[in-house]
């Protein structure tokens, strides 16, 4: 399920969603406006229902806008332009969230306060939210892979400061012992020389 909801599949789903709306705007827009689920959601949200004639000249303009909006995502998607989606998806999500709120709350303006504007903006919020989460997860995984955060416990080497300190102490003790031996040898030689001088003086 997680592999199916990657950023590429969600982006293709949005492109197909926009092309489908554009097709029905030219074919028969009432296939969408009179859909059962569409009407149920309209009544549940207590929104005015938009009615359009299937021969309205405005539908050609709507179809063109939806088609261009889909192509606007399709070209970067085919080029695998990840930076484009990382930049545009958060902004687009914010814009559609604001439009959804305005469409529901601004009851005096029937240009935006109707079921078609609200449901379309709500669908865009849902799709872009899924796309934003997928892009963020893929970005985090790529960051972890590049910085090698996943390190095995066997690869970690524990430092050994105490062993080094012990060896240094032993070396110092050996040097001190050698110095003491040299001093004792010098004292014995001095004593022997003094003894020889005393014996010569007595003779």
UniProtKB/Swiss-Prot annotation:
Topological region Lumenal: 25-58, 114
GO biological process: mitochondrial genome maintenance
InterPro entries, per the entry: Incr_loss_mito_DNA_1
Entry's transmembrane regions: 4-24, 59-79, 93-113, 115-135
Pfam families: Ilm1
Family according to the record: Belongs to the ILM1 family.
Topological domains, Cytoplasmic: 1-3, 80-92, 136-203
Organism: Saccharomyces cerevisiae (strain ATCC 204508 / S288c) (Baker's yeast)
Biased composition (Acidic residues): 175-187
Name of this chain's protein: Protein ILM1
Ranges of compositional bias, category Basic and acidic residues: 188-203
Localisation: Endoplasmic reticulum membrane
Domain of life: Eukaryota
Main location: endoplasmic reticulum
Gene: ILM1
Misc note: Present with 1160 molecules/cell in log phase SD medium.
Residue ranges of the region described as Disordered: 175-203
The UniProt record lists the keyword Endoplasmic reticulum: yes
Cellular compartments per GO CC: endoplasmic reticulum; endoplasmic reticulum membrane
Membrane topology of the entry: Multi-pass membrane protein
